[in-house]
Amino acid sequence: MAVMNHLRVILQVSSSTLPWRRCWVPRLVPRRSCSLYTCTYRTRNRALPPLWENLDLVPAGDRQSPINIRWRDSVYDPGLKPLTISYDPATCLHIWNNGYSFLVEFEDSTDKSVVEGGPLEHNYRLKQFHFHWGAIDAWGSEHTVDSKCYPAELHLVHWNAVKFESFEDAALEENGLAVIGVFLKLGKHHKELQKLVDTLPSIKHKDTLVEFGSFDPSCLMPTCPDYWTYSGSLTTPPLSESVTWIIKKQPVEVDRDQLEQFRTLLFTSEGEKEKRMVDNFRPLQPLMNRTVRSSFRHDYVLNIQVKPKPTASEVTP
């Protein structure tokens, strides 16, 4: 999950103030199955941006993100109710390239754009949303499901304004943030997403920003209410373990041309040697002792239907 400039990308917190340690990191990330071609940990991480060049620099935490979600191991929780999302399109402010992703930011001084319900005890205000994507369609999402990756992932970032005075404070504390993750898959053209895509040429370079008014990001949500949830962290430094993750089960469809426009953005500022903005995701992290809960029963998700046994009269001799 990319952190916006309000945190100055790393919340202006130096590594000396965080519990960092250097240690050997085993290759815990499973092989990612893709329909196009084999998508392995090594292949996927070969071209990661400079943020993740030193993969042995990890925080001394036990609830890091992203993770691989295993359907079989997730636990159905009947107490998880549907999310209630209420976004005011008028709170949309601007879109900008922060050098790691492109973000759409919202006015968050009041509860005009909020999410509640599900695993959340309070209303959380929408601060921004952004995407992660790959250099090719075989990967790009930060989270995976049964080791399957998607070409991109949307993150809608919210903060707990009941317990905290500011987004910056909330981002560093437990239960401070709630992030909704939505997978993107190749399919039909996404009409609402096109408004974002049409703006991307104007923010091609790092630190470019343009106004982007009246947009309701709920149009980017899948219709299915089902989701997984777990306790995790930011996926960019300082990697604070402050996030309640809510990962939607159903992906949304976008067409290949729309995704290709994401890849025209640059990590670099104007005048610098161009470096395409691709593979802007963090490597998978071990689950440790956490439980991933689901709002749905597994047999429903897998569309398993138990057919009744035929009666004697229905059996063909």
Swiss-Prot record:
Q: What is the lineage of its organism?
A: Eukaryota, Metazoa, Chordata, Craniata, Vertebrata
Q: Mainly resides where?
A: mitochondrion
Superkingdom of this protein's organism: Eukaryota
Where Zn(2+) binds, per the record, is at: H130, H132, H155
Family note: Belongs to the alpha-carbonic anhydrase family.
Transit peptide: first to last position: 1-33
What is its cofactor? Zn(2+)
Q: Which GO terms describe its biological process?
A: response to bacterium
Q: Which residues bind substrate?
A: T235, T236
Q: List, alphabetically, the InterPro entries matched.
A: CA_dom, CA_dom_sf, Carbonic_anhydrase_a-class, Carbonic_anhydrase_a-class_CS
From the Swiss-Prot or TrEMBL record, give the protein name. Carbonic anhydrase 5B, mitochondrial
Summarize tissue expression.
Answer: Expressed in the heart, liver, lung, kidney, testis, and skeletal muscle (at protein level).
Q: Which GO terms describe its molecular function?
A: carbonate dehydratase activity; zinc ion binding
Q: Which top EC class is given?
A: lyase
